[in-house]
Amino acid sequence: MSLNSYLTEAYGPKRAAKSRNGSKREAKVSNVSITDSAEQLVFTNNKPTGHATDIKAKAKRTGLFKNLETNELTEFKPASEVQEPNEVKMSSGAHAGLQSAEQVAEQIGKKQREAQREAAAAAVNKETVFRDSSGAQIADYSTYMRDRERADKLRERFQQNKSREMNMGDIQLHQLRNPDWRPARCEGEQIRRDDPAAQFTAESSAATYKLSPLGRKLYNKAWPENRFQIAPGWRWDGVDRSNGFEQKWFAKQGELAERKAQQMAAQQDY
């Protein structure tokens, strides 16, 4: 006879017994249930008080089981809710240490089922949570995207304006910042030709000089050509103190233009 059978016969529910006068009397049904597996038992550390009335009152509760050795009441919980002891677990869900292949497979499967259950519970009736680059949660995603697009357009426009201003000269920047500005004319052009008093200013007109669009005095004689057509200042003494790069640059440009013209002519001849 197994231990479970013995405990069931000794402490389990009994059949109704006949009394001496022939009438059946009610059998006392025990509230004690015998279980084979200890995994479904969770101890509540109820110390025995020694009072029979307290034990009977606790025994009337549903889902409570009595430990025959310690006389403690335990609560029944399904195996999925039973907390495992504090054991070291690996990332796969298996416990560390020497175990059988069946135990390892069961532990890994249990972790996978828990992950699937949590994912399914999180996906039900849940709204999508949007976050920005810093990790902060976005309350209104549509408004956030609209503001972000507007900020991107403003940033792009700023970069375009900045690059355009970098490629401008002083005159273009001055015109951009002062829309009503007009370039200054030469002093000779400012003199009215139909002015009867112009004949008295012949000597002064001979000494006139040109002005730049910004109103600066320019050199009024011949000066060497440069790539940017920048005239020297009006105080220049006419001595070229450069390293000759401008002359070499113009010579190279002329050589390239002549070579290109020769190639075009040779292609047309064939």
Swiss-Prot record:
Keywords: Cytoplasm, mRNA processing, mRNA splicing, Nucleus, Spliceosome. InterPro entries: Bud13, CWC26_splicing_factor. Transmembrane segments: none annotated. It comes from Eremothecium gossypii (strain ATCC 10895 / CBS 109.51 / FGSC 9923 / NRRL Y-1056) (Yeast). It is found in: Cytoplasm; Nucleus. This is Pre-mRNA-splicing factor CWC26. GO terms for biological process: maintenance of RNA location; mRNA splicing, via spliceosome. Involved in pre-mRNA splicing. Residues 1-31, 81-113 are annotated as: Disordered. Its main location: cytoplasm. The gene is CWC26. Disulfide bonds: none annotated. Associated with the spliceosome. The keyword Transport does not apply. The keyword Lipoprotein does not apply. It comes from the Eukaryota. Coiled coil: none annotated.
